[in-house]
Amino acid sequence: MAKVLKSSQSCHFPSPSSSSSTSCGGGNDGSNRDPHSPFNISRREEEEEEEERSEKERERFELSSALEILVSAIRRSVIGGCVGEEDLCSMEIGVPTDVRHVAHVTFDRFHGFLGLPVEFEPEVPRRAPSASATVFGVSTESMQLSYDTRGNIVPTILLMMQSHLYSRGGLRVEGIFRINGENGQEEYIREELNKGIIPDNIDVHCLASLIKAWFRELPSGVLDSLSPEQVMESESEDECVELVRLLPSTEASLLDWAINLMADVVEMEQLNKMNARNIAMVFAPNMTQMLDPLTALMYAVQVMNFLKTLIVKTLKDRKESRDKLVPASNPSPRDHNGDQSSSRQLLHLMKANKEETLDNFEAEMKDKEESADEEEEECAESVELVDIKKSSLVNNSSGGFGQKHIGWEEQRTMSKASSIVGRVNYRVELFEAWR
């Protein structure tokens, strides 16, 4: 009873001390209304955790379903590839395991790819005449190579420049390879050469300068593989030839091409005023690369002598080869191969005609001499008759008329005989002169 009264009193008579108890007594109703109560906060956290768990379970389910679909697809493809049915296996892409697709195409550094389908052509960019962006200052390994007339493998751009230099009469121009071209035109021609084009209105001096520049701008000089001591010690032609054989194949081909180019220039020395020493002097600094300018200048003198010796030897070899082609003077109508040359045949034909003409002339002169002898005999007989008549007339006649008549007959007979003898002597002199 006491407890009930107390509870009723606390409910009907609020007091400051009982206010808290009232709030506590009515906690079940107030807890649902106050959002900041500890009970509501914990419940809200539980609900969020449940939602997170449900989302994770949903993601796991979706992932597992996707994996199951992927695994089933792979399983079907593998099973389909392993099935013994030929039709099914032929349709599968992954069945061939050892397949090679070989395509043969032609690559032209001047015009790009050749032989590709038409639909691929617009996508293929045009390339420079070498694998690099320029033909100057790059290695010969990255350039298009061709064979020259001597079988040397050299860059195609060098052969193009050489051909244009020869066709434009550059070898006959005075000071070729010594006189430099215009800088502005040289830069323009460089750009055109990088495109694989040589302009038509090019100056031969500019073209010759670009040939020297090509050698000068190589990553490594043509003679850099040889030591300066080896070059200095090579003085004779045989020593220089042996030294050239020590060069790598690429450098040896480039040097042989350059030496023959310089020899062609020297053969036109009367027109271009460039002898072996002059052309070797302008090419020597372009064949080596040294950091020290003074050392490079001193070494260039030795290289000049080396190049000069090779040029002179090349000219000698050319002269010997030309002499072998021309048949030597031989009295025999046949040469060392047993064949008759056209000039030899013509010479013998002219000689035979001359001998035949002389024989005919001798026969004719012999006939005329015989006729002249007969005439002389007749003249002699007539002279004897005249003498006889003269003596008879002198002895028998006593007047001057008879003497006058005898003198006229004698003069006429003697003049006729002398004219015949003179004509015979003239024929003999003519025959002797013809001999």
UniProtKB/Swiss-Prot annotation:
Acts as a GTPase activator for the Rac-type GTPase by converting it to an inactive GDP-bound state. Acts as a negative feedback regulator in tolerance to oxygen deprivation which requires ARAC4/ROP2. The keyword Magnesium does not apply. One of its GO terms (molecular function) is GTPase activator activity. It comes from the Eukaryota. Gene3D superfamilies: CRIB domain (3.90.810.10), Rho GTPase activation protein (1.10.555.10). Keywords: GTPase activation, Stress response. Residues 1-59, 321-343 are annotated as: Disordered. Residues 7-23 have a biased composition (Low complexity). This is Rho GTPase-activating protein 4. The lineage of its organism: Eukaryota, Viridiplantae, Streptophyta, Embryophyta, Tracheophyta. Residues 138-319 form the Rho-GAP domain. Residues 93-106 form the CRIB domain. It comes from Arabidopsis thaliana (Mouse-ear cress). InterPro entries: CRIB_dom, CRIB_dom_sf, Rho_GTPase_activation_prot, RhoGAP_dom, RopGAP1-5. Induction: By oxygen deprivation. GO terms for biological process: plant-type cell wall organization; response to anoxia; signal transduction. Disruption phenotype: No visible phenotype under normal growth conditions, but mutant plants have increased sensitivity to stresses induced by oxygen deprivation. The keyword Chaperone does not apply. The record marks 178 as: Arginine finger.
